[in-house]
Amino acid sequence: MEETPTASDAADRSLVQRYLDGDRRAATDLVDRYQRPVFTVALRMLGNAQDAEDATQEVFGTVFRSLTTYDPRFRFFSWIYRMTVNQSLNVLKGRKTMVTLEEQLAIPAAGVAVDDALEAEEQVRKALTVLKPDDRAVVVLRYFGSLSYEEIAEVLEVPARTVKSRLFTARERLRTVLLSQGGD
């Protein structure tokens, strides 16, 4: 089903075309527009700010090297999100040491005063690391990227029903992990 282009899609196409026409300011505009969402997806996928910054730089390097191959019939945000997920998966595959489940889910030492909201966010972040990378990508894009099932399917190049299935599996796994954290 062909989607009606949005104003955002038109703006993206315009920026890409300006860049391809030699307007280097368009590169800055594209980075300004997508740096935060790309970093957020990478951070949620990788679980650490330094890796997310490195991945974000790699993504933008790839974007500008590959813009001549971008097909404007497709949404730019899907293209750049796909690159972000791929780069994040590459980083995850390249990590030499695997942290044990117990280490990933370690609760801060007793006596450490932590705001409940920050502690809950930290528990969710740690729980995300337990998910398989494909499941983590679906959760990150849905809940931190606010993408619809159809948009996630477009980014990950899978059917929407696969997105729904992965999301169900991931939520169940997260629920189990989070309940085990609270049930000392």
Please give the residue ranges for each predicted region:
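Amphipathic, Lys/Arg- and hydrophobic-enriched alpha-helical face
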Residues: 31-49, 66, 128, 173, ...
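A short pre-motif secondary-structure segment
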Residues: 138-142
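Short, charged helix-capping/linker segments at alpha-helix termini
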Residues: 2-5, 20-29, 39-58, 160, ...
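Sigma70-family region 2
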Residues: 20-21, 44-49, 58-75, 94-96, ...
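Internal acidic/polar
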Residues: 4-12, 97-126
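Arg/Lys-rich amphipathic alpha helix in sigma70-family domain 2
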Residues: 65-72, 82-102, 117, 169, ...
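Structural recognition of an alpha-helix C-terminal capping motif at a helix-to-coil junction
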Residues: 40, 54-61, 74-86
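DNA-recognition helix of helix-turn-helix
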Residues: 85, 89, 127, 135, ...
